[in-house]
Amino acid sequence: MNTFLIDYQRIQTPKKGFSRLFCDYTSDTEARAKLVSNCFHLDYRKDADYYRHLGLLASRDFKRNALVELLLKQNSRFGGSERQRQEIEKLRSSRCMAIVTGQQTGLFTGPMYTIYKALSAVVIARKQKELFPEYDFVPVFWIESEDHDFDEASATALFAGAGLETIQAEGGHRQQDQMAGPTPLGSGITETVREFLDLLPDSDFKPEIAELLHSAYTPESTFEIAFATTMNRLFSNHPLILLSTQDAEFKRLAAPMLCKEIESAPASSYDVVAQSSTLESMGYPAQTKPRAVNLFYLNQLGQRLKIEQPSPENFMILPDRQRYTRHQLLEFCQDHPERFSPNVILRPIVQDAVLPTFAYIGGPGEVSYLSQFRKVYERFGLVMPFVIPRGSFTLVEPKITRTMDKVLKVTGKPSFSRRQVYEALFGNLQELRKSMVSGAENQNLDALFEQVESEVTRSLSTLEPALVKMDPTLQQALAGSSGQIAKIIGNIREKTYRAGRRKHDELLQQLDKAELNLFPEGVPQERLINIFYYLNKYGPSLIDDLERVLQGYSTESHLIVEL
């Protein structure tokens, strides 16, 4: 696999690139140093921070045995392997730390970055073990199943034919604002799986994929269980641990943080506002806006309802307008923590209170919003873990690689490399198109044909005096021959131009196909396309291949991998 690294700063996809904050965070600039010192607690580039955080986590009192029992039960439910069970058991020791990542449940695992997050956690856990052999590091995947964005959780996309197809699952009976994870798949899921499989071309690997999806996505299952079962099958040979936050046992572990949010509301929101002000003074926009209470209330139907704070000591649950005093709501949370769900601001706080989180592996958006939460961590008496960018890939199929070779020939200078073609493609696609048009038309041809015509005319003119001297009638024959030669050259010129235009059109069509493959709907491939499109063509070993690529490279650059 040929692999090329591109700095995030160079990437500008048709719809949008990466935020300036994320580009600075992955750069080697003064801006990064300022960002880290003002918005994060730890810098993953500083060795001293590693030793400091290891000592801190080893000394903290986590409910490790309760956590292990919960994870064992969950992973058994999700079809976890013996290797995963062994990884869970390691968490009983105070010298075991978690490398955490996570994502919302997605149909058939959703966009490819879900897989890349899991792989990144596995690889970074292994690298930390190599650096600190006296400690254990286990990769934990937090399943965000309490999110109520059902449209996102129930859809996925893949390439089909000459375009893009989106598959949407209807799900069983569902209320508005109901959590996506526990939603039943319903009777329509069998047809959804069939539609998805029909879009995959026949291959040696398709029967195995069909068996996996049909067994995981059954009418009586839920979006969360199907997602977790599929992830466990894909990572059965890897030490990945899945964590669901829906279980009442987990909420009991999280109860101190949930209750503290109610007890101190709206203090954490003020913390976010203050940290956001620091960000904005550095020129970065705030990504997340806090609420007075950064919790949702879960009713009996599984709906996530907002909690408002109309006055300092009074709370209201919307839209039902149930009213509680602070004391009443706090007592309710202490007795029934399973009825509360953290929002995007409190979620990482709960995560790092329950888990011995050494590092969080996040995407560009997560790095941005975590930069707003430093003061919230401090309020809850926590140190923010290392925030490490996840692995980011673009997979380039052989047909697209061949197009890149043609682009290289048309636009290339003697020293132009394939990597520079990718940089041009990811950096300024329109400029690359102009280069291709210019290269295909070959503006030097006009001058070359004019030079040939001039030389032929001059050569024939040189013959004329000698021919006339020999026989005056030859002058007419010479003139006729000159006209014929000019006509022949003109015909060759026209055929050359037609070939150039045809080549130009073919190249642009091929570039359009490459653009669809690399930037479907104008966004990076990893944010939209489902991994099974590639597993069907290249086999389940593709996940192992990408793991090896990640093992050899930093996640601070985007990785272009030619398959």
Swiss-Prot record:
Highest taxon, organism lineage: Bacteria
GO MF annotation terms: ligase activity
InterPro entries xref list: Bacillithiol_biosynth_BshC (IPR011199), CC_BshC (IPR055399), Rossmann-like_BshC (IPR055398)
A Pfam family annotated for this UniProt entry: Rossmann-like_BshC
Coiled-coil segments on the chain, per record: 494-518
UniProt KW keywords: Coiled coil, Ligase
Enzyme class, first EC level, given as a word: ligase
Membrane-crossing residue ranges in chain numbering: none
EC number: 6.-.-.-
Family affiliation: Belongs to the BshC family.
Listed name of the protein: Putative cysteine ligase BshC
Species this protein is from: Chlorobaculum parvum (strain DSM 263 / NCIMB 8327) (Chlorobium vibrioforme subsp. thiosulfatophilum)
Gene name in the database record: bshC
